[in-house]
Amino acid sequence: MKVASHIAGAEFSVRDYRPTDFETLWRIDQRCFPRGISYSQLELNSFIKKRHAITLVAELQNETVQVKVTGSDKNVISDIIAGFVIAHSVRHKYGRILTLDILPEARRAGLGTRLMTDCEQRLQSQGCTEVYLETAVNNEPALRLYRKLGYEILRTLPEYYASHSLDAFQMAKRL
């Protein structure tokens, strides 16, 4: 499936996860992160089903999508999933962002900011006063976003992504 319109100016909405979203979310995760950092279907499913999990999905509204139908391409207007966030609250004290995934072609359109702020509000409504996350030390776009949202680096986690011998920053924010 190919998105034919220019995403940067697209309208989008954020909604709760539905089980029918799973395959799309997994495919987005595979596109966003290299093998060894991206999650298996089993891992992703366990995060979504975790007790007190929050999974929010960003959909681009009324996008023109090219679909192959009986051998020919057809343009269809549809809402498409362009990103998601998964988090959970721990004993209703603090939250953890497990993953934030935005399709490469949908980045810098505000989806990450909106998903994170909506997720933080949900965590706060569950009683969380802080939220934590980890991100690769070389993931500059994520670091810029998280700093813009008020996250601070707490410490470096050596070889957090062991399959890539890559360190991560643990970051936190008070809600």
Identify the meaning behind each predicted range.
Residues 5-12, 16-105, 116-118, 122, ...:
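Acetyl-CoA-dependent GNAT
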Residues 91-93, 139, 161-167:
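Short acidic/glycine-enriched loop/turn segments that link adjacent beta-strands
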Residues 99, 103-117, 124-126, 130, ...:
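Conserved glycine-rich acetyl-CoA-binding loop
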Residues 113, 166-174:
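Accessory recognition modules or surfaces
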Residues 132-134, 147, 152-169:
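Conserved catalytic-core motifs of GNAT/GCN5-like acyltransferases
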